[in-house]
């Protein structure tokens, strides 16, 4: 059962680190966009469009981290091997 405990721990840490990085990246992107708009209000349309594309790319990293963590939790390819090993050790 330690295998499943470690899978849950790995998924939790992976998701935490994935969202931490994307949160910091999105904050810095919005900060730069607001500074650029305050310096040149005429370019706010281009800045907003570029910022939205950048935020979508940054957010995709968090979605990839979520997908990997869900695979670790629910579709782990090593689950059967770990269960067989646990049964053989218990006998």
Swiss-Prot record:
- CDD domains (alphabetical): ATP-synt_Fo_c
Leader peptide range in chain numbering: none
Q: Which UniProt keywords apply?
A: ATP synthesis, Cell inner membrane, Cell membrane, CF(0), Hydrogen ion transport, Ion transport, Lipid-binding, Membrane, Transmembrane, Transmembrane helix, Transport
The feature of type site (Reversibly protonated during proton transport) is located at: 59
Q: Which GO terms describe its cellular component?
A: plasma membrane; proton-transporting ATP synthase complex; proton-transporting two-sector ATPase complex, proton-transporting domain
Q: Where in the cell is it found?
A: Cell inner membrane
Q: Name one Pfam family in it.
A: ATP-synt_C
Q: Which InterPro entries match?
A: ATP_synth_csu_bac/chlpt (IPR005953), ATP_synth_F0_csu (IPR000454), ATP_synth_F0_csu_DDCD_BS (IPR020537), ATPase_proteolipid_c-like_dom (IPR002379), F/V-ATP_Csub_sf (IPR035921)
> Which PANTHER family does the protein's record reference?
ATP SYNTHASE LIPID-BINDING PROTEIN, MITOCHONDRIAL, ATPASE PROTEIN 9
Function, as annotated, reads: F(1)F(0) ATP synthase produces ATP from ADP in the presence of a proton or sodium gradient. F-type ATPases consist of two structural domains, F(1) containing the extramembraneous catalytic core and F(0) containing the membrane proton channel, linked together by a central stalk and a peripheral stalk. During catalysis, ATP synthesis in the catalytic domain of F(1) is coupled via a rotary mechanism of the central stalk subunits to proton translocation. Key component of the F(0) channel; it plays a direct role in translocation across the membrane. A homomeric c-ring of between 10-14 subunits forms the central stalk rotor element with the F(1) delta and epsilon subunits.
**Similarity-based family:** Belongs to the ATPase C chain family.
Q: Which HAMAP family match?
A: ATP_synth_c_bact
Q: What protein name applies here?
A: ATP synthase subunit c
Q: Which organism is it from?
A: Citrifermentans bemidjiense (strain ATCC BAA-1014 / DSM 16622 / JCM 12645 / Bem)
What is this protein's gene name?
A: atpE
């Amino acid at each position: 059962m330690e295998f499943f405990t470690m899978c849950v721990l790995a998924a939790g840490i992976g998701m935490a680190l994935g969202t931490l990085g994307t949160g910091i990246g999105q904050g810095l992107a919005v900060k730069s966009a607001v500074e650029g708009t305050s310096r040149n209000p005429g370019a706010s349309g281009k800045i907003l469009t570029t910022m939205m594309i950048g935020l979508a790319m940054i957010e995709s990293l968090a979605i990839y981290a979520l997908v990997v963590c869900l695979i670790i939790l629910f579709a782990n390819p090593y689950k059967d091997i770990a269960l067989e090993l646990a049964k053989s050790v218990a006998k």
